[in-house]
Amino acid sequence: MNIKPLHEGFKCPTKGSDKSGGYDLYMPEGGEVYHYNEIGLKVGLGFAAEIPEGYVGLILPRSGKGVNHGLELNNTAGVIDADYRGEWVVSMRMKDQGSLRWKAGDRLYQVLIVPVASLDM
């Protein structure tokens, strides 16, 4: 998959192991997200990528960040189509009233690259 870095803090997505389903996405810079009522906090992931034709990227919170810290995506799941060439962005929010701080290089989200059916309708 072709990846174009857009931020000096960019780190290429990686799999935690050969059996991991998703590629961990690294935050290019630090920040903090608070509880937002349906607004979310838009944060760029510091890169653009070419997902192969016939596939789609699904961005989801890493399990521990969602379960243990209440981190979620404002739009439930980020969908990156094969023809999208802009910067990958997440709209973050917290389920609870608390906040979550992160540092550059932290892994908050993951992307699953999955095949997509093309059907005549």
Residue ranges of model-derived segments:
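DUTPase catalytic domain/fold
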Residues: M1-M121
